[in-house]
Regions:
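SAM-dependent methyltransferases
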Residues: 1-11, 118, 192-228
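Nucleotide and nucleotide-moiety/phosphate-recognizing core
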Residues: 3-156, 161-183, 199-206
Length: 228
């Protein structure tokens, strides 16, 4: 059997610079089985991207084994992390993934990259879910860097607002469903209760190969509000 494709045109970045206020401690380093939340995202991206880096404080990830970039513009949230990643990327396309979506499916990330390379859109994004909030998972081209920078300068730090400014390919909900994916992959673990729920499910089903086989999860507060 041939190995799944790795995209030489795509750099991968894990966004892990959040303050984790609702969790109460650093959620990126919370354990999920034999790996951490950030470690799981690194593993997914390594199977898909040419290179993988973390955007976050280097002192929080001394044993990451990959490059860790501090936010070049502090206090701007995920969009600030995207700015740093685009400036550091050595490829035309960059895949950004939040550290706090522990049910993410590598198959969907690969699908997102495929659609980005076919469409050549400035941004290729998942469908917006509850209250129109976009999951923090997207493929962006280097040419959007100027738009990111101007948004940050204007204090417009919301990722969803930025998406609406650029030419984008949005995966529709119908297309998402036809491709066999579940919205469960966008579940955010932002509180201790949400984390424990995910941890129990993953530990109970550690032999399953697809996250899509997991049971139902409610929409988390993070999906409703877009906060981290």
């Amino acid at each position: 059997m041939s190995r799944p494709r790795r995209f030489s045109e795509v750099s991968g970045f894990v966004l892990a610079g959040g303050a984790s206020r609702r969790m109460g401690f650093d959620k990126a380093r919370l354990p999920l089985g034999s790996e951490s939340m950030v470690g799981r995202q690194i593993r997914l991206l390594r199977a898909i991207c040419r290179s993988v880096s973390i955007i976050g404080p280097p002192d929080r990830f001394p044993d990451a084994g990959i490059q860790v970039y501090e936010d070049e513009i502090a206090g701007k949230g995920p969009l600030g992390g995207i700015h740093t990643g685009l400036r550091r990327a050595r490829t035309e396309f960059s895949l950004f993934l939040s550290c706090d979506m522990p049910l993410m499916d590598a198959g969907f990330l690969r699908y997102l990259c495929e659609q980005a390379l076919v469409s050549r859109a400035s941004a290729t994004v998942p469908p917006p879910w509850a209250k129109g909030v976009y999951p923090l998972c997207a493929v962006l081209r280097r040419r959007v860097l100027s738009t990111v920078r101007s948004s940050l300068t204007l204090g417009q730090n919301q990722v969803g607002r930025f998406f609406k400014k650029v030419q984008r390919r949005t995966i529709s909900k119908a297309e998402f469903a036809r491709a066999g994916f579940s919205p469960r992959i966008f579940y955010n673990a932002n509180t201790p209760e949400e984390y424990q729920k995910v941890r129990r499910q993953l530990e109970a089903l550690h032999n399953r190969t697809r996250v899509g086989e997991l049971g139902a999860f409610p929409v988390s507060s993070g999906e409703r509000s877009g906060r981290t």
